[in-house]
């Protein structure tokens, strides 16, 4: 993983799986999302000001899983508690959402997929972006991966037509 080009995936869920395995929490999912749930269950509390990001810089818009896991392994080998590593991982993901949004001039962020059922991650997103961003989550459509395609269709239609569609009423701001 740390030699060659790193883990290549477009699914954050697979990165949750890899971290869970690295931390000896779950090597094989017996159901979809098990590793992510077990990671989340390890977090009993956190203070956002005490969190540290494993990734500070995005190079050419690419998020380096190699750098992510190199920094996680550094903390693991130094004896940092598992719970702190997991908390910093969630914090890293939350910070990345806003880093990408800022680089692209986006203030309205729609979050979908199984990863955004993680209560700790969602709490961090609200804490970090509460005043500067509008966060949207599924209310009537399933938040699981099967509805990521809905967002992809909206992006495609907006780019193809060079105009923005109104967000349907059923997808309302969740605060």
Please place each PLM-identified region on the residue numbering.
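Short, glycine-/Ser/Thr-/acidic-enriched flexible segments
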Residues: 17, 24-26, 116-117, 140-143, ...
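Short, Lys/Arg-enriched charge-dense amphipathic segments
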Residues: 3, 10-14, 131-136, 158-164
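A contiguous, well-structured pocket-lining segment that forms one wall/lid of small-molecule binding clefts
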Residues: 1-108, 120-126
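Hydrophobic alpha-helical segments
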Residues: 22, 103, 128-136, 153-160
């Amino acid at each position: 993983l740390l030699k060659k080009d790193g883990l290549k995936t477009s699914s954050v869920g697979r990165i949750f799986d890899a971290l869970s395995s690295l931390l000896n929490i779950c090597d094989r999912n017996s159901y979809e999302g098990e590793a992510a749930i077990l990671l989340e269950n390890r977090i009993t509390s956190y203070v956002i000001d005490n969190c540290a990001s494993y990734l500070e810089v995005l190079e050419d818009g690419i998020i380096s899983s190699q750098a992510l896991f190199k920094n996680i392994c550094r903390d693991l080998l130094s004896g940092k508690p598992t719970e702190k590593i997991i908390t910093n991982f969630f914090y890293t993901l939350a910070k990345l959402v806003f880093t990408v949004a800022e680089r692209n001039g986006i203030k309205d962020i729609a979050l979908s997929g199984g990863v955004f059922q993680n209560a700790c991650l969602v709490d961090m997103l609200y804490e970090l972006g509460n005043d500067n961003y509008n966060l949207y989550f599924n209310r009537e459509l399933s938040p699981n991966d099967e509805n990521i395609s809905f967002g992809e269709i909206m992006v495609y239609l907006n780019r193809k037509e060079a105009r923005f569609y109104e967000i349907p009423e059923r997808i309302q701001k969740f605060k």
